[in-house]
Amino acid sequence: MKDIDMGKEYIIPSPGYRSVRDRSTIPGTHGDREDPSSGEQISLECQDALETAARVEGLSLDISVHSHLQILDEEHTKGKYHHGLSALKPFRTTTKHQHPVDNAGLFSYMTFSWLSPLAQVVHKKGELLMEDVWPLSKYESSDVNCRRLERLWQEELNEVGPDAASLRRVVWIFCRTRLILSIVCLMITQLAGFSGPAFVVKHLLEYTQATESNLQYSLLLVLGLLLTEVVRSWSLALTWALNYRTGVRLRGAVLTMAFKKILKLKNIKEKSLGELINICSNDGQRMFEAAAVGSLLAGGPVVAILGMIYNVIILGPTGFLGSAVFILFYPAMMFVSRLTAYFRRKCVAATDDRVQKMNEVLTYIKFIKMYAWVKAFSQCVQKIREEERRILEKAGYFQSITVGVAPIVVVIASVVTFSVHMTLGFDLTAAQAFTVVTVFNSMTFALKVTPFSVKSLSEASVAVDRFKSLFLMEEVHMIKNKPASPHIKIEMKNATLAWDSSHSSTQSSPKLTPKVKKDKRAPKGKKEKSRQLQHTEHQAVLAEQKGHLLLDSDERPSPEEEEGKQIHAGSMRLQRTLYNIDLEIEEGKLVGICGSVGSGKTSLISAILGQMTLLEGSIAVSGTFAYVAQQAWILNATLRDNILFGKEFDEERYNSVLNSCCLRPDLAILPNSDLTEIGERGANLSGGQRQRISLARALYSDRSIYILDDPLSALDAHVGNHIFNSAIRKRLKSKTVLFVTHQLQYLVDCDEVIFMKEGCITERGTHEELMNLNGDYATIFNNLLLGETPPVEINSKKEASGSQKSQDKGPKPGSVKKEKAVKSEEGQLVQVEEKGQGSVPWSVYWVYIQAAGGPLAFLVIMVLFMLNVGSTAFSTWWLSYWIKQGSGNSTVFEGNRSSVSDSMRDNPFLQYYASIYALSMAVMLILKAIRGVVFVKGTLRASSRLHDELFRRILRSPMKFFDTTPTGRILNRFSKDMDEVDVRLPFQAEMFIQNVILVFFCVGMIAGVFPWFLVAVGPLLILFSVLHIVSRVLIRELKRLDNITQSPFLSHITSSIQGLATIHAYNKRQEFLHRYQELLDDNQAPFFLFTCAMRWLAVRLDLISIALITTTGLMIVLMHGQIPSAYAGLAISYAVQLTGLFQFTVRLASETEARFTSVERINHYIKTLSLEAPARIKNKAPPHDWPQEGEITFENAEMRYRENLPLVLKKVSFTIKPKEKIGIVGRTGSGKSSLGMALFRLVELSGGCIKIDGVRISDIGLADLRSKLAIIPQEPVLFSGTVRSNLDPFNQYTEEQIWDALERTHMKECIAQLPLKLESEVMENGDNFSVGERQLLCIARALLRHCKILILDEATAAMDTETDLLIQETIREAFADCTMLTIAHRLHTVLGSDRIMVLAQGQVVEFDTPSVLLSNDSSRFYAMCAAAENKVAVKG
């Protein structure tokens, strides 16, 4: 296997990574490549850091899209249709890396023979791996087609403007040449399909009525029948061949264009993450289906007109009746299909909501489990699912009508036509009757494809609207204006900026400031300093401006808008956040930014990064950015790749960065050092590790401007000091650095300090100048000094020595816990997605049957299907029987002569035959309605039960499952797989069951007329068996590959959306786009082959069907005079019907099995996922008022995160007294977070026990335990919904209690400003609140809960010092009678604790009062305090 060279030898093969198959150019692996659109050279260091994700998923990298473009450019000079026309050449040469379809001749192309070698490979191996699959053709590559679609869309926008622009017209132009050609092929199919029944079958049946035999003439008729069927089959195959390639090109183009747009968005507030995932999974599929099936709609009117004309010629005026039935049914089917599409459209919205909520649940599952909110979220998802199910049921009824109409309409048309024809006194012969019936059968093609076509076009129409709304969203524009002075890096002049928020939101999107300072020290008089010390003159009007919603008339153009990018009227609302910002930052300056929670610090740096809308003033920037977000964004890649972020590996610089960011000790405890794979969102890292990796990425990038948003908040004092001095002050000495922080001691060393308040810069200058100003800054800094003065003197000389050593050892619980247990695969965290092998086991079908209601329900459904098809067959047989009876031996008198009549109109029982014939139609309609209702209810019950059981299993899975499984993979089960089970599987299963029974009836009818027919069926059955065995494996394996390649690109979308700000700042859009194109093309390759494999089978099955109809024709010829013409007509009509039906049925069998792989994947999770302990254990529930005291006892507690991993807690024993306040400190990897994991039983103990008030927590249910504990997490978590639902999901508290909690957390005024107060919307991830505000709401949530035991995990890290002090005071008061465990890195937050617990290497090494520990200068706690305390004491 080739290693991918991304900078020396730093990427090594992972077990999940497969060979790259002799590809000359691999995206993201070769240096110096040219982007045709920009002409820029993209060197090796600009490659996508997500390369390694492919290894985990077992994916390959396709031929470079750039090499594609080069080849296409060369071919473009030969003519636009050169490649298409070259298929007509009798001799062709194969070029390297060419997809077989590109080299296929016309015969091979339309019969899909180019796919046969792959079918042979699969048959021999019994399975299919990605290395067996050809890379996607250069003509189908997503990049090539995206560029074309993008150009067409841009031309449309330029021509008519964004409001009038039609994406439908653009899509039509994109596809039209190939679609027109496919429609021409479809016309040939229709003409051939019509000619056989209309002319050949008619003459053949007339021949059976003739008394004389003419063998030569009759054999020519059979030959004609054979030829028309072959032309029909192959021209239809060519239609599909063209449509499938068109569909794949359109899907690749529109999905790539969508992701390209996502990467350019300012924010995604108008689109939820669930909607974007749905767009990129289901909507892309709908665009493909529209291109593949939509053009078949054109065949309907043609065959209807031809059939009507022909029937009138055969029967006279009554021929209009049957055609009228078809003509009436055609718009009726269109209407029903549109109704189906309407309900599908409503269902899509419900699915979006469900997927979004599922994504939220999966993202914050740890928090949901700890808060015992599993039931609340389960009910929320179930409520959405119930609404989705209700809509699906309505859509299912209409869909069932469309499936069953085709065979019914033939009977209805026949009954109406022949009954009226006979009633009016016209005669009817077998040749006439069965020619008309056969023509009716050929006309059903229009009705068969109508539900597919209309459904696909209607759903695509919805998808197009969603894509268009995405394409018209406002893009982020990096600031291009340069400051006037070369020494100035950032310049803002009188800048007023606003955040964009969703237009549909019930509220504005506030970045509000909690009024934490009211009744506090008022700012003293301010003086104007020479260094432009600023205090805003707008304090009087801030309250009025705050929360002011800007309507469209208030929108003012930004520099970006002046370049043609405008905010469209009514498209969004703007929330003013920053006011009249005047700022100049010189090159090489370290600028500290501070202020209270929600004061606008993050907004200020977002404005500099171009993330906000400029309303007034100007912004100018000179240089490139490196950005460290407040909540670190970590890729699912190796630790090294996260730091390199696509740049070339420079060992010296890399090692220097590791040292500056204190990452060396962490590498020592990771199983594969810096090549250890990091989970999604840094799942196997602590908050501090994530932040340091994010900082290391910035340092390694070597940019000119560094924007650091509170990068030290999650770090302990020693590490924070080291990083500030070594990384920020020393390493970035010559760089321009914007350093946002709440830890004011660091501002002492900044060249300049900016203090923000309510969206304005109120103070600015050096630390000394601001202290002399004696304003807000001096007030909060003095509070810091007062609050942190230790009771004993600390000598800080030891800070750099002894304390560092303890960090080098000991397993880091957050990292060790989620590693792969098997040592041979060290460093690999995310497990390769399982892929089923062999055929779908019967147990999967049994699971589906059981979910649908059990064997009895299945038997009832099957009986209804048989009765339904049987009633259709009976009506046709009754017609032949009626014709055979003729006059019923009635005697006709002509003058003096009498003779036996042959005319049916003379039959004395005419009314009897006609009544039975009409009654059969009524019975058939009733049975169809009953069958439809029962089938829809059964399949929906199955899909709903599978969904509910899957959801239950996922929610009850232990944390190790979520740590080793990408969210995209789990979401794939709930989005694409559930879509298959909800919609596509029932649709195809219904047709399959109906058609397979119909096939047996057809063969039975023909065999009843010609018993010798069964002799010919024998060899054909052998051929069919061989085909079925080969195709079944091929189709099933390709479908499985399609399923597993879907997950990585969905994960990539999710990850990219979460890191949009970072991607923008580092200007890595192109690299992430290339990675997406690779993942999409890897999915498109098996997806395209899967669709082609269906037609490969269909063409070959059609040959068997043609053999059957030819055999029937020969039987009629050779048994001339032995068989009544009525029965001969019956046989030939069923034989003609069998031609398309047989291949369609067998293809449906393979496709239905392929769809069942989604059931298999869902069932795999249901059967294999291990479960946590029960939520409640009967007879073991603790007392209702437990715990009364809050005493916690650990007795020799041992814990490891998975088997075969080292212990992270080693025989830990201690007792925490009731109401005691404990501070827990320790270096990274010491086991602090593991204590919390053990207490909440997120991981079960390996040994020992934990007791709360004497009750062993392992003996009670998880809900009983977790509901009695409260936690305020390190990273604040808000869910989409309302403020109330975030604080009180179970509606347990009164409004007064909620407002009281908000007041005590200083969020009351913030929430009171919102239009809907407690019912105001909280956006996904709480994006309409700052990180500090989110944390305050989390504290309010804990206040409401008021448990006897509270764990604070660095709960106030995202707050300014003053808010921190106020909140600490609130917590002390509110939880005075509670046992409180505080895990902290900022040591001043635990100095007031009753006792301090110091952990090292999973053991308690010190546990005493702060005064005792600080009086011992050799204690670990003393050494840890030295860094922070010394800094404030000396510099302050």
From Swiss-Prot:
Residues 514-529 have a biased composition (Basic residues). InterPro entries: AAA+_ATPase (IPR003593), ABC1_TM_dom (IPR011527), ABC1_TM_sf (IPR036640), ABC_transporter-like_ATP-bd (IPR003439), ABC_transporter-like_CS (IPR017871), ABC_transporter_C-like (IPR050173), P-loop_NTPase (IPR027417). It is found in: Basolateral cell membrane; Golgi apparatus lumen; Endosome membrane; Cytoplasmic granule. It comes from the Eukaryota. The keyword Glycoprotein applies. Residues 562-783, 1192-1426 form the ABC transporter domain. Its EC number is 7.6.2.-, 7.6.2.2. Glycans are attached at N494, N636, N684, N889, N896, N1043, N1328, N1416. GO terms for biological process: cAMP transport; cGMP transport; export across plasma membrane; folate transmembrane transport; glutathione transmembrane transport; heme transmembrane transport; hyaluronan biosynthetic process; purine nucleotide transport. Residues 19-36, 545-559 have a biased composition (Basic and acidic residues). The modification Phosphoserine is found at S14, S19, S43, S60, S505, S509. Residues 179-459, 858-1154 form the ABC transmembrane type-1 domain. ATP 2 binds at G1226, R1227, T1228, G1229, S1230, G1231, K1232, S1233. One of its GO terms (cellular component) is endosome membrane. One of its GO terms (molecular function) is ATPase-coupled transmembrane transporter activity. The chain crosses the membrane at residues 179-199, 219-239, 296-316, 317-337, 400-420, 426-446, 608-628, 847-867, 916-936, 996-1016, 1017-1037, 1101-1121, 1126-1146. ATP 1 binds at G595, S596, V597, G598, S599, G600, K601, T602. Its main location: membrane. Residues 12-40, 499-569, 795-822 are annotated as: Disordered. The modification Phosphothreonine is found at T513. Keywords: ATP-binding, Cell membrane, Endosome, Glycoprotein, Golgi apparatus, Membrane, Nucleotide-binding, Phosphoprotein, Repeat, Translocase, Transmembrane, Transmembrane helix, Transport. Although other labs have confirmed the ability of ABCC5 to transport cGMP in an ATP-dependent manner, they obtained a much lower affinity for this substrate. The authors conclude that ABCC5 is a low-affinity cyclic nucleotide transporter and a major function in cGMP excretion is unlikely. Belongs to the ABC transporter superfamily. ABCC family. Conjugate transporter (TC 3.A.1.208) subfamily. ATP-dependent transporter of the ATP-binding cassette (ABC) family that actively extrudes physiological compounds, and xenobiotics from cells. Mediates ATP-dependent transport of endogenous metabolites such as cAMP and cGMP, folic acid and N-lactoyl-amino acids (in vitro). Also acts as a general glutamate conjugate and analog transporter that can limit the brain levels of endogenous metabolites, drugs, and toxins. Confers resistance to the antiviral agent PMEA. This is ATP-binding cassette sub-family C member 5. It comes from Rattus norvegicus.
